[in-house]
Amino acid sequence: MRRGIALGFCAALLAACAADFRDDVPEAANNSTTTTNPTAKTATSINEQPDQLDDGKSRTTSTTLAVSPPTTTYQHSDNEEQEEGLLAPYRGTPITEASLVAPRLALKIDNAPTALPQEGIQEADLVFEELVEGGLTRFLAIFHTKVPKFVGPVRSGRSTDIPLLMPFDGALFGWSGANWAFRKLLNTVAVTDVGVYRKPSDYWRRTDRPAPSNLWARSAKLLRHAPDDLSPPEPMWPFRTLGQPVVSEAQPTEGVDVTWGSTDVSFRWATELGGWQRFQNGEQHLVADNEGELVALAPQNVVIQFTKYLLSNELDSNGARIPIAQITEGKGTAWILTDGKVIEGRWNKPNVTVHTQFADATGQPVSMTPGSTWVLLVPRGAAVLIDESD
């Protein structure tokens, strides 16, 4: 029933439901000092007013970089044995039966310069990166096989999130705020809203970060709000088995460069990490684990989904119109980077209720390498592949 309501409501509101450039709650007292370099100024132009949450807690991040191959074993309990034949639906790695029906948590994560380093996002099974105002990006991170104790910084939702969230029936969605139209539309989607307005005790503001990039989720606690009758989620795509080669049409590549506007992103194949190491604005994109150690982001799969963006009629605080990705349904070009190679193919989303499908040039579904996958909703013409000879 909720899906039927969502389909009708989505058509009327999705184009109008632009991002709100301010979180709707008054700013809490914060003694942190905001950097005044030009990059930080760009971030400030689109930052929202923070929620009134501050329990005085801060977290210490180590400057030690731990560069090591990512673990391939993910489960909710270390005491459970993985059952042969069961695979995590979004990661393709072995999983227990109990973990297969565990809650899924979607969190909206900040990626402004003031948000770095983020915490916990490296554990996500799946991350969507989308363009927001000011030429910056934000992440929609999907956690299932492993949910860190803390994740942050959490920011507000965007209209682009609705067609991404709709296929994740029964998932939890944590976020900091958005405009009234987004909130109303979110109520029609078959996800459980566990945003800061509904579950304020499961969030806190760090005092060692500038607002509004200082809202952290007690992500493991958010799982308590999941429904009891969860069903195993359907896999989003097939996964390669051990020893199975990438399709013959795949070509070796060093990686990909993406220009978002104010944010430049690169992925480079890193054999020692077993994935595509991410760089942002010319530097390694490092994130913190829950012990405060910095680690490199290196997902096993990177998908460049070339996407049309339209500018809404809503303006940010600098008078800039706010972009919305046109991904409710449709098709287009996609590059799938996996195991040091690229498959130039197509993406197809038949309707708003299903996940986007990725196929090679022959129309066959692309098999991902087991591990994490990042899907970048890149504006057309804003990405370039890097040949091995370059």
Task: Report the location of each language-model feature.
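Extracellular mucin-like PTS domains
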Residues: N31-Y74
